[in-house]
Amino acid sequence: VLERALARDAGLGWIGKHSCLINKDAGSWFFLGEIYTDLPLPVDAPASAHCGTCTRCIEVCPTGAIVAPYRVDARRCISYLTIELRESIPEALRPLMGNRI
């Protein structure tokens, strides 16, 4: 399920340069979930993007996983390293992660 695209199209936020959905009130620190229904619900307009020239997420990514706007190298992403990687975290990335586990 393309959760971010569905959430964007539903007006819940916009896709930031870090490739996560950003909600104007909640930021990007939340989980997405879906309920599929055939109920006739009102449709919200998609949210417009507000990143503009901001590159803060790229600048502060501790492991340099955001290699370009809208492009993430998952092999450097802390979420991948701590949840999905089935081997030891590469030694070069450990100091960059700090206590973010």
Regions of interest found by a model, annotated:
Residues 1-100:
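Non-ligating segments of multi-cofactor redox enzymes
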